[in-house]
C-alpha cells in the first residue's frame, strides 16, 4: 500500500542509554524517509553517547560501548539530521511519548532549534490502541480463544468476575508467570 503523503515522512526509532530525557543519550537512530512520490531512503546510525552504555541496555539492545566508540556524537550529527528532517512529518511506535521528546532534547543539547510543533507526529502505538478494542471481551477472546458472549452475559458483575478470572489464568499461562 502506498502512503498518501503531502510531505516527506520520517519513520524512525531510537535506542538510548536509558529512559531519562535529560540524563540519557541516543546510541542508535534508524529511519526511513518516505517521499510523497513513494521513494524511500533508509539510514541506520550508531551514535557515541559520550558515556558508558548501562549493562541492562546492552542486554536489551545488543549495542555495546565498542559498537559506538568510533561513532559520531549526536552534536556532530545534529546539523545533517536537522537538514534531512526539515519539512518532514514523523512516525514511530510509542514515538510521541519517548522518541520525539528524546530526539528534541538531543537537538536542544546540540544547539539546534528543531521545532516539532510544526510537523505532524504519527504514533503507530496510539493508532493501534484506538483501533484494537481494549476491553474485557477483547482480552477474553485473546487469552481464552473464545468470544465472551458465547460464555457469559456481559455487564453482570458475577459473570464479568468469572471472565476476568479466566483472562488472568490465560495471561499467566501464556506469559508463564508463577507468582503475582
Where on the chain are the PLM-derived regions?
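Conserved non-catalytic scaffold segment of RNase H-like nuclease domains
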Residues: 1-118, 133-155
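Active-site phosphate/pyrophosphate-handling residues
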Residues: 101, 125, 162
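Short alpha-helix plus adjacent loop in nuclease-associated cores
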Residues: 121-135
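Generic alpha-helical structural context detector
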Residues: 126-129, 141, 166-169
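Acidic, divalent-metal-coordinating active-site segment for phosphoryl/phosphodiester hydrolysis
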Residues: 156-167
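Conserved anion/nucleotide-ligand pocket segment
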Residues: 171-174
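Conserved small/polar residues in nucleotide/adenosyl-binding loops
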Residues: 178-180
